Amino acid sequence: MHVKKGDKVQVISGKDKGKQGVILAAFPKKNRVIVEGVNIVKKHAKPSQANPQGGIITKEAPIHVSKVMPLDPKTGLPTRIGYKIVDGKKVRYAKRSGEILDK
């Protein structure tokens, strides 16, 4: 998967196209990610110990990883990702500027 938890991304297709946010969770086996403030859904929650009132809760739902594109740290624009070996480690870099994404 070309994105990781904590990456700043932009949604490139679907109803939330153009929105930007941080990846809160990634599910590589399902090829899905949860992006902050994107794909908001309403869930009906039964009353429980943690939520004695119950009711309708809004939260982010996963979207397919192909719908998001990482943002270039230098320009702030969406970019494709490449991989290269630096000091014996495989790191991701932004193809738009050449900036390394992994610390």
From Swiss-Prot:
This protein's GO cellular component annotations are:
ribonucleoprotein complex; ribosome
GO terms of molecular function: rRNA binding; structural constituent of ribosome
Name of this chain's protein: Large ribosomal subunit protein uL24
What SMART domains is this protein classified in?
Answer: KOW
Q: Name one GO biological process term.
A: translation
> Which species does the entry assign this protein to?
Geobacillus sp. (strain WCH70)
Q: Which domain of life is it from?
A: Bacteria
Gene name as annotated: rplX
Q: What is the lineage of its organism?
A: Bacteria, Bacillati, Bacillota, Bacilli, Bacillales
Identify the keywords attached in UniProt to this record, alphabetized: Ribonucleoprotein, Ribosomal protein, RNA-binding, rRNA-binding
Which InterPro entries does this entry report, sorted A to Z? KOW (IPR005824), Rib_uL2_dom2 (IPR014722), Ribosomal_uL24 (IPR003256), Ribosomal_uL24_CS (IPR005825), Ribosomal_uL24_KOW (IPR041988), Translation_prot_SH3-like_sf (IPR008991)
